[in-house]
């Protein structure tokens, strides 16, 4: 049936009407009386009935429909249920069969015919082919590449972004190759990791803009929507991560505790004291450790290609998603002793703690044990050889948090005769892992065993600016670690 709609409009006489005029009750017109009732279409009291019914419904407050939608799933929703209620101690088989490693090694060292590679990069590719064939030991770049390739072959995606991550700040990666005969600067690139298998996961590598906060913030958000992709943000130097401190504090370290927002984001922060000054030495390990609680993050400082291989694979294969902060090396990228074999990848796994590697060191004769993390291990190793010391052992802590307490206690039992235990670190005493790790170490000690500190003195700056001063500090901390100099800090668990 047709219906008439009547509008009654009261003019407020332009915009400058005094406010007291429109506030007065100007009355209203009962349209129903004018039309419907007079024509016999509706009863005369119909409008009043509708008003009464409306007000009664409003007063009752009854919901006409269930405000909670059931069985609803947004098309953008991500299923995180497979990764809930898991633990960091859950086992993960990160080993890859030797034949598969060799196949992957061949694929990532194959380039298209006629592709002109830069001579220096060509040497890197040829060396990697020799590594895949077992003719050379694996270096850091190859361990990393095989980790990416194997993860991709397993169907997971890999996304790597940062200010210089295609090549790598220290030219160790070369994930993207460039044709030296290209006619245009923006063409002629080839990415071997995009060609490891027919049904592989997606590999993306992005040289980002020079903004740590913006890029890390984006990658954090991306990672919360991609549980099956290894999302990595790499800082040009670990020192520059402080430009994104808000993202680290507000989201990465505490997002799950505050909002239940899970992420498997990985941070690669180049860290190490090589005399490059206060802005290119420290990724501030102490700050990340201070943020750790309730198993909210994983803090790892790997020292071998096998370790970076297994920890990257563990991040995806294990049904456990927490942020992974990797303090990656700089000088170890080409260090002659920071190497691994294909067997280490094919048969091994990630080690929370790496014990003494020299079989000539007799645990029963060891009186002093040095515990450290990162690149300092290789300086200590070289100094021990030079001094021809066989009465001290060197242990590496590869995962700082969550701390492998049982693994460390096993090392303490192994050196039951050792009374002097030393934590040695590159960083100043008020920085680095010292204040965090000493409690874990002391909890494992028996009566009569004491803990000492060997490292740089407390400093407002992360590092000194002169190489000579840097080297003098290094010599002093090694002497302290070996017991040839007075320790800067001493605590004990001796009998009272």
Give residue spans per PLM region:
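Flexible, glycine-rich loop/tail regions that form catalytic "lids" or insertion modules at the edges
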Residues: 2-496
């Amino acid at each position: 049936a047709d219906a008439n709609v009547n509008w009654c409009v009261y003019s407020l006489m332009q915009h400058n009407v005094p406010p007291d005029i429109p506030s007065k009750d100007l009355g209203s017109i009962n349209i129903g009386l004018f039309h419907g009732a007079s024509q016999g279409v509706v009863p005369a009291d119909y409008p009043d009935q509708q008003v009464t019914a409306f007000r009664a419904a409003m007063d009752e407050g009854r919901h006409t429909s269930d405000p909670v939608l059931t069985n609803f799933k947004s098309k953008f929703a991500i299923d995180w249920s497979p990764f809930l209620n898991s633990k960091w101690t859950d086992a993960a088989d990160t080993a890859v069969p030797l034949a598969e490693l060799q196949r992957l090694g061949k694929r990532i060292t194959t380039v298209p015919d006629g592709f002109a590679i830069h001579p220096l990069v060509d040497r890197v590719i040829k060396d990697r082919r020799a590594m895949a064939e077992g003719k050379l030991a694996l270096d850091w770049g190859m361990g990393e590449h095989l980790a990416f390739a194997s993860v991709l072959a397993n169907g997971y995606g890999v996304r790597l972004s940062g200010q210089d991550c295609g090549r790598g700040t220290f030219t160790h990666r070369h994930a993207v190759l460039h044709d030296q005969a290209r006619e245009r600067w923006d063409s002629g690139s080839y990415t071997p990791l995009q060609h490891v298998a027919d049904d592989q996961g997606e590999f993306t590598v992005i040289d980002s803009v020079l903004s740590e906060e913006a890029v890390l913030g984006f990658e954090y958000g991306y990672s919360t929507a991609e549980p099956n992709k290894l999302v990595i943000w790499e800082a040009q130097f670990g020192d520059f991560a402080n430009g994104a401190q808000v993202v680290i504090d507000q989201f990465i370290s505490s997002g799950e505790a505050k909002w239940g927002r899970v992420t498997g984001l990985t941070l690669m922060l180049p860290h190490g004291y090589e005399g490059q000054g206060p802005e290119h030495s420290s990724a501030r390990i102490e700050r990340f450790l201070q943020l750790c609680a309730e198993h909210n993050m994983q803090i790892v400082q790997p020292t071998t290609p096998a370790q970076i291989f297994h920890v990257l694979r563990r991040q995806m294969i294990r049904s456990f998603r927490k942020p992974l902060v990797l303090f990656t090396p700089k000088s170890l990228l080409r260090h002659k002793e920071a190497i691994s074999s294909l067997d280490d990848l094919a048969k091994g796994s990630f080690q929370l703690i790496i014990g003494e590697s020299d079989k000539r060191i007799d645990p029963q004769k060891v009186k002093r044990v040095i515990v450290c993390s990162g690149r300092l291990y290789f300086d200590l190793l070289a100094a021990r050889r030079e001094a021809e010391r066989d009465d001290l052992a060197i242990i590496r802590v590869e995962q700082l948090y969550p701390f492998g307490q049982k693994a460390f206690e096993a090392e303490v039992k192994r050196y039951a005769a050792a009374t002097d235990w030393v934590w040695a670190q590159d960083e100043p005493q008020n920085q680095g892992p010292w204040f965090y790790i000493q409690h874990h170490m002391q909890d494992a000690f028996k009566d009569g065993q004491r803990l000492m500190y060997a490292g740089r003195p407390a400093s407002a700056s992360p590092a000194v600016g002169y190489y000579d001063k840097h080297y003098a500090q290094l010599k002093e901390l090694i002497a302290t670690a070996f017991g040839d100099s007075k320790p800067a800090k001493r605590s004990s668990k001796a009998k009272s």
